């Protein structure tokens, strides 16, 4: 359980937590017959590339990993598109649908005095557009990108870097994320954790439990208030 006297800062993951990565299907619909299938493989491969990059010291900005992953997903489905068409699809990551609960939940935390940050694998340009598109610029102190230290989640150094950037002892930060691997990484580094389980997934059967499991950002705010 949370010790509310201890938590002063809340970091939020971005993709899948604040914005809906499944919205990428919209950008694919004009180009492929099975946008849902391509979108899922695109997302899965993108995460796999970020995990692999951390293990073999092959860092590239997340937008570029996303580009490689899109190419793989299209190739796997036998879809041949021009570079311009691929770029058009890729640009959806600058305007993914924002979950309706994001701003109300973050507003409650902001009004209660918490310092709010976005902590993401996304490179700075992606995060700038996300904050603008989500209309949360007035609520967050800043964004913190994996690009700053060239390490992706769930590397402990990224969460420790976030603690340094926010000027907060790591055990006074609550990290709110939709990805269980992200929650585990934050917990391992010493943060409090809130898993946003939007699709009612089963919990991972290893490495402990988050401090709280919620359905959305508004419920996350209730847990912290």
Protein language model regions, located:
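Asp-based, Mg2+/Mn2+-dependent phosphohydrolase catalytic module
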Residues: 1-6, 119, 123-124, 128-225
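Active-site neighborhood of HAD-like aspartate-dependent phosphohydrolases
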Residues: 1-47
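Hydrophobic alpha-helical core bundles mediating ligand binding, dimerization, or RNAP-core interactions
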Residues: 25-28, 42-46, 66, 89-93, ...
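Alpha-helical elements of Rossmann-like donor-binding domains used by nucleotide-donor carbohydrate transfer enzymes
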Residues: 26-27, 68-72, 88, 104, ...
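A short acidic, helix-capping loop that chelates divalent metal ions and anchors anionic groups
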Residues: 27-28, 50-55, 126-128, 202-205
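Short, surface-exposed acidic
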Residues: 34-41, 77-87, 139, 170-171
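A metal-dependent, Asp-based hydrolase signature
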Residues: 50-88
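Short, acidic loop-to-helix structural element flanking the phosphoryl-transfer center
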Residues: 81-118, 128
């Amino acid at each position: 359980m949370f010790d509310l006297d201890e938590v002063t800062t809340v970091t939020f993951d971005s993709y899948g937590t604040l914005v809906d990565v499944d919205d990428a299907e919209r950008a694919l619909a004009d180009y492929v017959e099975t946008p849902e299938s391509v979108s899922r493989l695109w997302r899965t491969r993108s995460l796999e590339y970020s995990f692999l990059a951390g293990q073999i010291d092959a860092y590239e900005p997340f937008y570029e990993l996303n580009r490689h992953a899109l190419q793989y997903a299209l190739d796997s489905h036998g879809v041949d598109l021009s570079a311009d068409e691929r770029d058009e699809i890729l640009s959806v990551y600058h305007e993914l649908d924002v979950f309706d609960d994001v701003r109300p939940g973050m507003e409650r935390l902001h009004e209660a005095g918490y310092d709010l940050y976005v902590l993401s694998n996304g490179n700075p340009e992606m995060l700038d557009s996300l904050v603008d598109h989500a209309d949360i610029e007035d609520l967050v102190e800043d964004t913190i990108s994996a690009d700053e230290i060239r390490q992706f989640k769930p590397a402990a150094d990224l969460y420790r870097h976030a603690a340094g950037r926010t000027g907060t002892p790591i055990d006074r930060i609550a990290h709110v994320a939709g990805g269980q691997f992200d929650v585990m990484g934050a917990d391992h580094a010493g943060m409090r954790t809130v898993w946003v389980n939007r699709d009612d997934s089963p919990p991972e059967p290893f490495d402990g439990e988050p401090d709280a499991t919620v359905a959305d950002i508004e419920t996350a705010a209730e847990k912290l208030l």
